[in-house]
């Protein structure tokens, strides 16, 4: 079914793909046709052409031509030798010229690259001129600010010096006052110690007197307390009856008893125990009054002793409190003086540090400006060299000063420019240190 559709002349051309054999049939058909035409031409040439006459004439012409060609070959050989020599020379010259051409091309490429780099550097440094002008202006402003800061710093240093002198005078005055207070407190302390010592001695003496008085009081009390009037009177009567006088009076004869003197003497002797009792009672009352008086005096002495102890303790406490207050006042004054002095020194150090920072910044900006000027001069000279090497009528740009109306400087661009300059100046310092270590 597929073969019938392939061989049909009415078959559609886009239905199936044609194979290699389909194209080979037409190729062999055309090859056979060409072979047939060649054979037919040869047969006609052999039939209708004069082969011998044509061959002789062709042979003579060929000999003549061979002779001429031989002569030409000999001449050409000689010319070939000459040309080969010239060719060798030309090849050497060509190689030399090619080397010079390559060298010239490399030099030209290098000069072109250098020229392009110089053009880029020229554009860059033309843009840098604006930053350099801004740096110069900022340097002038920094110098003016440094002058103002120096004036302010000198004024502040003068004020601080005056303040330090005033504080030193106040400290000297306070020290004098403190020394006077200290001397007065020491004198009060010595006086208080003397009073305290005197009070201690008086207390010891009073204690000794009190002990003696108490011992005497105890003795008197031990004697007076057990005294009983009736018992004492009975003891006196019994002692009277046991006495020699009573027995003598009792043993006297009767006629002596009738005498009036005997009666008065007997009454006197009998009333003697009562009189003694009365006297002893009066003596006891006097002793009791003395004991009470001594007791009151002892109580008064104890009270005075307590008052003196309290006064001594109060004086000691006042002395300690005054010493503590004076010491605290002296410490406070010293701390205040030290704080004021430290503040003055810190302000002075801060002002000096600020002035040193401004001076270092000014020096750094001066160095940056000098480096930029040197680098710009080097780049301009390199650019002039490149321009002369290219032999182009290029006019070097004017970098002597900024344009009359420069555009405003972007602070971020200016900081970036400063950062690049610092990095470019920092790199040569790092590389020499890194080379010996490797």
UniProtKB/Swiss-Prot annotation:
Keywords: Cell membrane, Coiled coil, Cytoplasm, Glycoprotein, Membrane, Signal-anchor, Transmembrane, Transmembrane helix
Stretch list, region Disordered: 391-413
Disruption phenotype: Mutant animals result in lethality during prenatal development. Examination of the homozygous deficient embryos reveal subcutaneous edema, hemorrhages and defects in the vascular wall of subcutaneous capillaries. Hearts of deficient embryos show ventricular septal defects (VSDs) and thinner ventricular walls, as well as blood abnormalities.
Pfam families: PV-1 (PF06637)
Topology feature Cytoplasmic, residues: 1-26
Tissue: Expressed in lung, kidney, spleen, heart, muscle, eye, pancreas, thyroid, thymus, submaxillary gland, prostate, epididymis, uterus and liver.
Keyword Lipid biosynthesis: no
GO CC terms in record: caveola; perinuclear region of cytoplasm
Topology class, membrane: Single-pass type II membrane protein
Compositional bias segments (type: Pro residues): 394-410
Subcellular location: Cell membrane; Membrane, Caveola; Cytoplasm, Perinuclear region
Top-level taxon: Eukaryota
An individual GO BP term: positive regulation of cellular extravasation
Record protein name field: Plasmalemma vesicle-associated protein
